[in-house]
């Protein structure tokens, strides 16, 4: 059970924007994909193009149904051409694992669900680099956006990627459960503020990031959700949902996501009607 807030959503939101915040994101899923056909398999099941990847780099993408709607949005990281790490949304762990497994028939790939064995923390904010550098044995300035490294926090082994869900600079870290409390406390001691799911949601909304079940879902396509840049032609590769998505990308859709800017005080709730 993840806390919605530790102190207040506003304070935690502002702490991430002005200094640094720490999020426990251990509820998210983590899979390991291994085998000689991993890249071929992911090219078939993802809408983004893995030819744009390289070892030590991650990529944001979606898995889609044949009708183009979204199974899940996620990030995967290429450790080597036969080994990928994948981070998926918490609500979709079982569904994603089953979806991946159901499409393995023709591919030499093994999928391991590490979700319950590993913990995850997001360390986000303008001071994230500076504060984290004193704790790790790698030069963080050499880890560019969406790249990752294996290193240690005070002798505890971690996987660290320059990714995030706040719109700020920062990192997402994965490690064995046994190190969780020590790593969390080490990060807190840098002066960063713990932040809950409420601030995580307000920060991602401010940064215009999609959340599964809201801006994207099994009834919304990436093109409708403003993610048409993820839909790649991948010449010669017939990936799941390609026909529908490429048509939507070229011809447009009947509906699309838009942002609203309030001119007066108020809160726009999900499913509110728009009258004009």
Predicted region positions:
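Conserved, structured C-terminal
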Residues: 1-4, 10, 79-276
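A generic structural motif
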Residues: 34, 64-66, 263, 275
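Acidic, proline/glycine-enriched N-terminal capping motif
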Residues: 1-61, 69-71, 198
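Well-ordered mid-protein domain cores that form the structural environment of catalytic cofactors
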Residues: 49-103
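Charged, low-complexity, helix/coiled-coil-prone segments
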Residues: 32-47, 71-79, 122-133, 188
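Membrane-targeting and insertion segments and their boundary/processing signals
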Residues: 12-16, 67-70, 74, 106, ...
């Amino acid at each position: 059970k993840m806390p919605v807030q530790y102190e207040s959503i506003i304070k935690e939101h502002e702490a991430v924007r002005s200094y640094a915040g720490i999020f426990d994101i251990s509820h998210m899923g983590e899979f390991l994909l291994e085998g000689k056909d991993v890249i071929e398999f992911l090219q078939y099941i993802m809408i983004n193009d893995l030819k744009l990847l390289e070892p030590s780099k991650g990529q944001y993408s979606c898995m889609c149904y044949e009708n183009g709607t979204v199974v899940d949005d996620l990030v995967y990281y290429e450790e080597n051409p036969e080994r990928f790490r994948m981070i998926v949304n918490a609500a979709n762990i079982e569904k994603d694992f089953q979806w991946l497994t159901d499409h393995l028939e023709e591919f030499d790939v093994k999928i391991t669900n590490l979700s319950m064995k590993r913990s995850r923390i997001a360390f986000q904010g303008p001071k994230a680099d500076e504060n984290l550098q004193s704790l790790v044995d790698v030069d963080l300035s050499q880890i560019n956006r969406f790249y990752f490294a294996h290193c240690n926090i005070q002798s505890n082994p971690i996987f660290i990627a320059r990714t995030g869900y706040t719109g700020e600079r920062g990192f997402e870290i994965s490690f064995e459960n046994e190190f969780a409390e020590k790593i969390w406390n080490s990060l807190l001691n840098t002066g960063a503020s713990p932040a809950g799911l409420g601030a995580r949601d307000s920060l991602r909304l401010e940064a215009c990031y999609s959340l599964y079940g809201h801006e994207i879902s099994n009834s919304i396509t990436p093109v409708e959700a403003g993610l048409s840049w993820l839909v790649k032609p991948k010449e010669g590769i017939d990936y799941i949902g390609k026909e529908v998505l490429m048509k939507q990308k070229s011809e447009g859709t009947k509906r699309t996501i838009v942002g609203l800017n309030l001119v007066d005080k108020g809160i726009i709730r999900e499913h509110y009607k728009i009258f004009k």
